């Protein structure tokens, strides 16, 4: 079976896959050591990124990070550690130091943080069903929101939704502002959205879907001056393009404004840009972004979506 999976993954990369994504923390008991090593071996052989949601134990436990760092070093796989702030929690500085040491020793490891302070996932996720999530996140039922209604849960409503709507989603509020500040100041940190799927506006999701980047520009660049404007922009554009260029040279034309680059441009006012999306009302548009250009075509004009404008094109890996 492992050999068959290896063939299928290689075929996917041949057909334009940009890398390998692994929700390891959500599949903790379903992925064997041999399967995990095989995935890293393919990423190393093909030199495409493998993005991993590492296994989590107790609060801030770095064993899951060390596991994937060792595999990346042994297989020469480009490793992307997702959501370092939400996984490392109060030990984010230690996690970043481990990544720094690995990179200094020749590894190729990157990571990202979100700009909103809650985690969002299914109420039936492995972390809730089979582990001490209250101890892990240092929260209780009252720190968890049912996304569909915005209500704060109790033990009784948690058990009710788990039983009656196991596919429903929750936001669990546990991330501290100082953790995100530590992460954002790491020299090559990237900012990610990671919103839950938004099928239509009637189905609630995370505010990440509409406010991630405007929150960085408004809160962390302008208001708190944690980042310079150029640093903030690089964390949301250039660094991602440079990372993904390992899989596709098309990304050499992304994340930068220069002759020959793709005309994907966000025009914003640094004095007014602000995220308005919040938990419970996740689709509120940001202010201070009057124009967005994709592939040379306006998709936002005077702050409004341009009806029928879909110029975006998928990018495939070089194979």
Language model regions located:
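Active-site neighborhoods of metal-dependent hydrolases
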Residues: 1-30, 69-73, 78-229
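Divalent metal-binding pocket/active-site signature
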Residues: 2-3, 11-67
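Divalent metal-coordination and catalytic microenvironments
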Residues: 16, 53, 112, 194, ...
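Structured core elements
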Residues: 19-21, 51, 80, 110, ...
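Flexible loop/turn segments at secondary-structure boundaries
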Residues: 27-31, 57-61, 87-91, 117-121, ...
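Acidic, glycine-enriched loop/beta-strand segments at the rims
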Residues: 170-174, 180, 227-234, 242-283
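C-terminal cap of metal-dependent C-N hydrolases
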Residues: 181-188, 193-196, 265-311
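N-terminal alpha-helical segment
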Residues: 213, 236-237
